[in-house]
A protein has these predicted regions:
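Conserved alpha-helical scaffold segments that buttress catalytic/binding sites
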Residues: 2-269, 273-358
Length: 358
């Protein structure tokens, strides 16, 4: 596909930034100048699709870009291309489809995609990129709610998850929620997700030991982050925020954990509402979140294989030898994985998910 036809350019002048600032290093799609994607590791872009929130408000992301590109690169440089703003479809469904096509093309080219939106129903576009490639996937949502919606509710930012679960063909291998708040979800929703053997992590339990969810993020194929998961006092530019939620440093730590996984293909930050921002506080936070992701991305772990010389292999026998499994420990960073034996040819399609981070 022609990337240039899927995006609108943005204004950017690299000469306005100091040496070492991201703005002097990133390759941005400006009028008449599309980035050379063969020289990029990561592509970033914005999505103005907002109809899933029943809003026609024109979203603007200049503040986020200005704050991000004013930050200095970390110890290691990541090659970044800014594709500008994804074009709006005639309907939200058209936008989802265009997003799915773009993300599938990014994956085919070996490019990681990070973008800021827009309403969270665009998560459907992230998921559809895996449906189109017939690839089973693990989804992680960092969100104060589950967004299951009501029975037969139209697809929007508050009901997108039920539509993903019901979408055919179904390639959702696992779903995990991080940072839900108990008073914002019903017991029926929790029981429903438990029946599907999905993983949900309450804000309080997550906060007591943030590192425990690192394996969950390391196992994700795509991640959808709702800014309402962050405390409204620390991120005021949100839709339907809460006085409770993740702190700025906690969400930045989750961003870094997310970047370490070798399966991850896209990361999206949703439900940004710049009109609610105060002194660019939210724009600054989002910029620093993305910076933390870039730092983690440089240390991205390579795919795990049973013959990897950097791994120590531990054989474990269970039920008096009835079952055997293996644990793998990376010698360099002490990360662990568990290998689930593939017992039949039918399960070969799930092979990428049989090394489980732990």
């Amino acid at each position: 596909m022609e990337f240039e036809l899927s995006f609108d350019p943005v204004e950017h002048n690299s000469n306005e930034f100091r040496s070492g600032q991201l703005g002097s290093l990133v390759d941005v799609y400006t009028p008449g100048n599309f980035p050379n994607l063969s020289e990029a590791d990561v592509v970033v872009f914005s999505i103005t699709e907002n109809r899933g929130l029943n809003s026609d408000e024109k979203l603007k992301f200049e503040a986020i870009r200005n704050e991000l590109y004013s930050l200095y690169q970390g110890e290691n440089r990541i090659r970044i291309a800014d594709l500008g703003t994804l074009k709006l479809g005639a309907s939200p469904s058209d936008t989802y489809q265009l997003l799915a096509d773009v993300l599938q093309e990014c994956n085919d080219r070996g490019l990681f995609a990070l973008f800021v939106g827009g309403s969270q129903d665009c998560t459907v576009g992230q998921y559809k990129s895996f449906v189109q490639s017939n690839q089973f996937c693990n989804m992680v949502a960092i969100d104060s709610r589950f967004d299951l919606g009501l029975d037969q509710q139209n697809l929007n930012a508050n009901s997108y998850l039920s539509h993903i679960i019901n979408l055919q063909p179904n390639v959702l291998f696992n779903y995990s929620n991080l940072a839900y708040q108990s008073y914002l979800v019903s017991r029926n929703e929790i029981e429903f997700l438990n029946k599907l053997f999905f993983d949900v992590h309450r804000l309080g339990s997550l906060r007591s030991n943030l590192e425990e969810v690192e394996p969950v993020l390391r196992d994700a194929n795509f991640i959808s982050l709702d800014l309402s998961a962050v405390k409204m006092s620390e991120c005021p530019a949100v839709v339907d925020g809460s006085p409770n939620g993740l702190t700025s440093d906690e969400v930045c730590q989750l961003m870094r954990y997310s970047a370490l996984g070798n399966k991850l293909q896209s990361f999206a930050i949703y439900n940004f509402n710049g009109d609610n921002d105060i002194n660019n506080q939210s724009a600054k936070l989002i910029a620093q979140m993305i910076w933390c992701f870039f730092e983690g991305f440089f240390h991205k772990l390579r795919a795990v294989t049973a013959n990897d010389e950097n791994l120590v292999k531990y054989h474990v026998s269970m039920r008096d030898g009835e079952y055997n499994t293996c644990f793998f420990k990376n010698k360099q960073n002490d990360k662990w994985w568990m290998e689930i034996p593939i017992l039949s040819d039918e399960n070969q399609k799930f092979a990428p998910h049989f090394f489980v981070p732990c």
